[in-house]
């Protein structure tokens, strides 16, 4: 399954708590879509959020964000995991 890192540039006011809630919404929405959100990272100072997801395509990954909470990614990169 392809692995993607997506980036959200949300700006001021982003909190770890808000992102945790959005991630839980992703997990509740991803079922049956062959999408698996794995981890996320938050930089509160820059308002950036990074999500790691297994999905058949970038669009499939972003569709979960769209349907779960509407916060679609600004950028999505297919990545390979290293040691």
PLM regions and their residue ranges:
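Short hydrophobic/aromatic beta-strand micro-patches
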Residues: 9, 52-54
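Short S/T/G/P-rich N-terminal loop/turn motif that feeds into the first structured element of a domain
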Residues: 1-31, 36-38, 42-47, 81-83
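An amphipathic, aromatic/His-enriched active-site/gating alpha helix that lines ligand/cofactor pockets
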Residues: 30-32, 54-82
């Amino acid at each position: 399954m392809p692995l993607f890192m997506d980036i959200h540039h949300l700006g001021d006011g982003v909190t770890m708590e808000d992102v945790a809630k959005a991630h839980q919404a992703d997990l509740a929405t991803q079922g049956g879509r062959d999408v698996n959100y794995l981890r996320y990272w938050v930089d509160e100072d820059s308002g950036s959020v990074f999500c790691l997801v297994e999905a058949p395509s970038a669009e499939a990954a972003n569709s979960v964000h769209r349907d779960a909470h509407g916060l679609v990614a600004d950028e999505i990169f297919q990545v390979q995991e290293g040691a």
